[in-house]
């Protein structure tokens, strides 16, 4: 329905929804006949969940099972069946060349599918540093930890009762014996202590996992903040989804080494604090897996930085920033483009321009019911502004072919910039955007066809081939992501990662994790992904989501200062005035960030 807004007196269609799967929806604007173009929906942002609806159900059930098992363990009533011992002779393993990470994950039990999602997220981050090997922990063989620079184990299955321990005794023993960094996240650290001897564990690490639990005072509490490097990071997990944070039982006195508290969790109701991440000897322990309900200022930042300690400890402090201009189509307003470009040039700020080469309004939503298609070649004034941008510090980026899907409402109206292109979606009765999966025709050939047509659109307008890609509304299939990697040097975006990817099976489009990064990574699709991690300017509240103003972007940039070599990367729609962009850039620069172009982000 139409309602009047104060901005220039123009009518605006109410925003319908944000993506409640891995990415968010946004706002759709309408202009009077004869105007250049509607303002697209601001949909390219990550949802605080970062898991698909099916994976959300898994998460809730796993949280309940964790709490039940933890209570049984506290009373001594939880029986843990050890993993079977495989009698094999292990040959000496040669270390991997260069920096390498071993990511071990759980994949057994009724919610074992969560383990692969978390492992992909971890492998992606570790891909910033070097090569990554990810495998189920059950496939671990003796001596493997010494083959890699560092090892990360993700304890997502709470072993006990009807779910036998899948962690081989060899891993427990090797994690204890090695001098190489081991990062343990979440469950089953108590089983390691039991396997190697509780006293021996205590004497090496200075704490007792067998006396550490998720509840304190009979409750998980209301942990809503994690402090790390003087940055207050958010932790916002709704009731019923929270599996808690382990409260480590630290030991003091003769015979126990000092334990370093790296990050501190705080209960928002009681004010009580406890360690969220600790380190002693070669072991770093995090009290929860931090990949669900993430935000731009989230506690996942702690893990993103701690990986430097394990994989690149000599890294020098460096903080860079990046801005890209979003959703520029052949129907963009040249004067608006020129205004933004002039400001960025005056500040000597390099930037990216995300361009959609073909505009389509197949049902005439913004053209009085008359279908409309406009190519870049048919928009010389827009192309002139794009060329001026390229001559003054901009880098051309490809933002889809049409940024919409046929004549379908996908999920809104079929118009370029508003709808998904490489994924199907609908709006449910609660005004949530739900991802339905890839289009029926999705394939390598189909995706390549759209890319080929997009590149032809740039060439026909006399523009160079874009080196970088950003997926419309940040959603595509695993097949599409691999095709994109064959056509562009990198993607600059947030992405979806589907169950089945690590195992080499058919991707499960109903189970995925969405992720964004504070630095460049080589992801599990084999593609370089450049960061966008602090979101975008959006001045109006919509879909129960508050406005995101310059102060919010700056606050997220401040939180990301905790990443020792991180980026504060955001995007801005050029139909908005220059002033909010100026405020955002000045605020980020005041934090000590240096703005760079997109190609520098991979360095």
Where are these regions (language model features)?
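Helical hinge/lid and interdomain linker segments adjacent to catalytic or ligand-binding clefts
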Residues: 110-191, 363
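C-terminal domain-boundary segment and adjacent tail
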Residues: 131-136, 307-317, 335, 339-362, ...
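A glycine-rich, often tryptophan-bearing local segment used as a flexible ligand/cofactor-contacting loop or short
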Residues: 158-237
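Metal-dependent polysaccharide deacetylase catalytic core of the NodB/CE4 family, i.e.
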Residues: 190, 196, 350-477, 534, ...
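Catalytic beta-strand/loop cores that center a nucleophilic Ser/Cys/Thr
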Residues: 216-281
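Catalytic grooves of carbohydrate-active enzymes
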Residues: 320-329, 334, 445-448, 452-468, ...
């Amino acid at each position: 329905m139409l309602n009047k807004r104060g901005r220039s007196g123009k009518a605006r269609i109410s925003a319908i929804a944000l993506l409640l799967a891995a990415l968010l929806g946004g706002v759709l604007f309408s202009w009077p006949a004869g105007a250049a173009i509607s303002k697209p929906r601001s949909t390219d942002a990550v949802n605080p969940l970062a898991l698909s609806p099916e994976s959300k159900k898994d998460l809730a059930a796993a949280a309940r099972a964790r709490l039940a098992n933890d209570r049984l363990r506290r009373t001594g009533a939880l029986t843990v069946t050890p993993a079977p011992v495989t009698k094999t002779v292990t040959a000496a393993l040669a270390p991997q060349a260069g920096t390498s990470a071993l990511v071990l994950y759980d994949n057994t039990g009724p919610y074992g599918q969560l383990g692969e999602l978390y492992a992909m997220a971890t492998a992606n981050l570790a891909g910033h540093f070097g090569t990554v090997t990810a495998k189920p922990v059950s496939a671990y063989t003796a001596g493997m930890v010494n083959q890699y620079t560092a090892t990360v184990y993700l304890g997502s299955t709470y072993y006990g009762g009807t779910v036998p321990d899948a962690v081989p005794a060899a891993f427990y023993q090797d994690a204890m014996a090695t001098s190489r960094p081991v990062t343990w996240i979440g469950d089953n650290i108590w089983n390691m202590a039991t396997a190697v001897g509780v006293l021996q564990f205590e004497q090496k690490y200075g704490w007792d996992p067998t006396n550490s639990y998720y509840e304190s005072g009979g409750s998980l509490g209301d942990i809503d903040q994690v402090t790390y490097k003087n940055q207050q990071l958010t932790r916002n997990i709704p009731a019923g989804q929270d599996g808690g944070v382990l409260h480590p039982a630290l030991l003091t006195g003769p015979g126990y080494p000092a334990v370093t508290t790296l990050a501190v969790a705080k209960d928002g109701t009681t004010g009580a604090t406890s360690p969220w991440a600790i380190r002693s000897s070669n072991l770093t322990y995090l009290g929860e897996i931090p990949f669900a309900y993430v935000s731009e200022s989230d506690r996942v930042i702690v893990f993103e930085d701690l990986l430097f300690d394990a994989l690149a400890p000599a890294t020098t402090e460096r903080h860079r920033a990046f801005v890209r201009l979003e959703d520029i189509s052949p129907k963009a307003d040249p004067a608006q483009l020129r205004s933004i470009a002039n400001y960025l040039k005056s500040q000597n700020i390099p930037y990216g321009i995300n361009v959609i080469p073909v505009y389509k309004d197949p049902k005439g939503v913004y053209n009085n019911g008359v279908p409309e298609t406009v190519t870049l070649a048919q928009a010389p004034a827009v192309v002139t502004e794009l060329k001026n941008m390229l001559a003054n510090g901009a880098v051309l980026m490809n933002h889809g072919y049409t940024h919409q899907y046929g004549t379908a409402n996908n999920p809104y109206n079929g118009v370029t910039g508003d709808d998904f292109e490489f994924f199907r979606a609908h709006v449910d009765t609660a005004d949530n955007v739900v991802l339905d999966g890839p289009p029926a025709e999705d394939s390598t050939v189909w995706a390549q066809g759209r890319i080929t047509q997009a590149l032809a659109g740039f060439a026909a307008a006399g523009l160079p081939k874009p080196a970088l890609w950003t997926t419309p509304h940040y959603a595509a299939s695993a097949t599409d992501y691999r095709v994109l990697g064959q056509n562009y040097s990198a993607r600059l975006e947030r992405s979806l990662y589907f169950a089945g990817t690590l195992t080499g099976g058919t991707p499960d489009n109903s189970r995925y994790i969405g992720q964004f990064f504070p630095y460049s990574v080589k992801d599990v699709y084999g593609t370089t992904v450049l960061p966008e991690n602090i979101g975008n300017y959006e001045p109006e509240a919509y879909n129960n989501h508050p406005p995101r103003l310059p102060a919010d972007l700056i606050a997220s940039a401040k939180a990301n200062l905790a990443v020792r070599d991180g980026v504060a990367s955001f995007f801005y729609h050029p139909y908005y005035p220059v002033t909010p962009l100026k405020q955002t850039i000045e605020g980020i620069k005041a934090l000590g960030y240096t703005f760079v172009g997109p190609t520098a982000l991979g360095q």
